[in-house]
Amino acid sequence: PLKWDNTMALCNRLHVQRRTLSMLETTHRLAADLESLAKCERGSQIVQALESADDEVLAALWAAAPQAARPIIKEYAARLRHIHPATNGTTLRNLGLKPVPRFGRILYNLRMAWLDGTVIDQDQEQALLAKLISEVTQ
């Protein structure tokens, strides 16, 4: 395989499109850590590792992955990347909160809770949301 610097030089010489170059960079970065991906146990860990990958990158990673990592990549592509809380920025504004950078943190924490199974229904999401809001507004 080409070293990354040589790959970049070749891409520049061939005038590779920016989108393709971005996919190559993402694939290179994620492929370097496929062994640790196979050790991910929580959904949030898998999402954090793979959320920057689009479908083409996921396909390339799956093809290059050791056998132990392939089911994890498949699980992310098929299910985990689609898990999001019902709460969104509009929900938070409707609750009277002013948009602040902490909105993102609240939504992130809710999503991670769904991914890890610590929240499994709307009632639990609402309880966690109330807790997160109280932490932000104190």
List each language-model region with its residue ranges.
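C-terminal subdomains that position terminal phosphate/3'-OH groups for nucleotidyl transfer/ligation
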Residues: 1-138
